[in-house]
Amino acid sequence: VVAVVAIGLLWGGQRRRAFGLHAYAAAFLALSALGGGFATTIAKSLVGRPRPPWNGVWSYEPTSSYPSAHSQGGITVWVALGLIALVLVPGRVRWVISIPLLVLGPVIGVSRAVLGVHWSSDVLGGWSLGGAWMAMSAVIIVLIATGAARRRNESSDPPA
């Protein structure tokens, strides 16, 4: 999903002559999703918390329980896509696209607790890690974008 959407953002930005904004959105999505997954993998290996005893009734997961990777991914992928839609999609359509994405992220986490493959604290940990990683990704992309804009402005200034 991330790769397809990132390619679509780049292609759409090129067609609309808004390549820079779309490229930053694609970079934000990639950094948020891939980095969040990496951070969750590290956290799972460090914590090593066992799954609830009812794991396997509805679904079985062999890895550690904390933090919930699905909860983290719901935030770093689906909520990130919803935020991108709020910025890039024009008009009222932005709400039709972004609201389901913004709701889907947290719902994924709730479903993991309902299925019995996570404790509720695993879900909260996944949401927290995902939200923190997504926010950090946004800050990094904004710093890169403002630095690039500053360099463009400095290079276009006439010499004194």
Residues covered by each model-derived region:
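Hydrophobic alpha-helical bundle signature of multipass membrane enzymes
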Residues: 1-64, 80-83, 87, 91, ...
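Membrane-embedded catalytic cores of phosphoryl/pyrophosphoryl-handling enzymes
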Residues: 6-8, 55-160
